[in-house]
């Protein structure tokens, strides 16, 4: 697990509070590569900022975040709320995207393909973007 920092965080470091922050604080955020604020962020910026608000330090980039915490498996059905989900659109499997699991195959993330903030149901077979995202899933990490 990733340790909370010794500075006072704005919010409690529990899964319900973290998933609420991810859904509410960043709702409407536009995609901005390298951004870390509700006025513009990318996928890993969202993850880093949300967890930082709760006193949990994570690295900046998705590929670095993929090394944080502990293995939570490769089965989307088994992921729990608060887990980080990692994806790749590269043949070599290098991590290129991260999302926060809300449980029950739901995620919150910032995606260029969605123009920014998005809540997704990864079992929505009618949505082409979701089908592609699900096919790109690599693994999950537990950081709580």
PLM feature segments, named:
Residues 84, 99:
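Short acidic loop-to-beta-strand element that houses the catalytic metal-binding Asp/Glu
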Residues 6-8, 36, 72, 96, ...:
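Aromatic- and glycine-rich peptidoglycan recognition patches
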Residues 30-81:
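Catalytic cysteine-centered active-site loop
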Residues 1-2, 92-98:
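Short, Lys/Arg- and Gly-enriched loop/turn segments at beta-strand edges
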Residues 1, 82-83:
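Loop/turn positions that initiate beta-strands
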Residues 1-24:
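Boundary regions of SH3-family modules and the immediately adjacent low-complexity/disordered segments
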Residues 87-90:
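Short, surface-exposed secondary-structure boundary micro-motifs
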């Amino acid at each position: 697990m990733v340790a909370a920092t010794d500075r006072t965080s704005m919010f409690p470091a529990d899964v319900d509070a973290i998933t609420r922050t991810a859904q509410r604080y960043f709702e409407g955020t536009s995609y901005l590569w390298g951004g870390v604020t509700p006025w513009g962020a990318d996928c890993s910026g969202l993850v880093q900022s949300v967890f930082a608000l709760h006193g949990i330090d994570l690295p900046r980039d998705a590929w670095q975040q993929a090394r944080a915490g502990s293995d939570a498996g490769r089965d989307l059905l088994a992921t729990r709320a608060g887990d980080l989900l990692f994806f790749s659109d590269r043949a070599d499997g290098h991590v290129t995207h991260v999302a926060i699991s809300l449980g029950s195959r739901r995620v919150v993330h910032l995606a260029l393909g969605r123009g920014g903030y998005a809540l997704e149901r990864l079992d929505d077979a009618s949505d082409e973007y979701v089908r592609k995202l699900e096919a790109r899933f690599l693994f999950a990490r537990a950081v709580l």
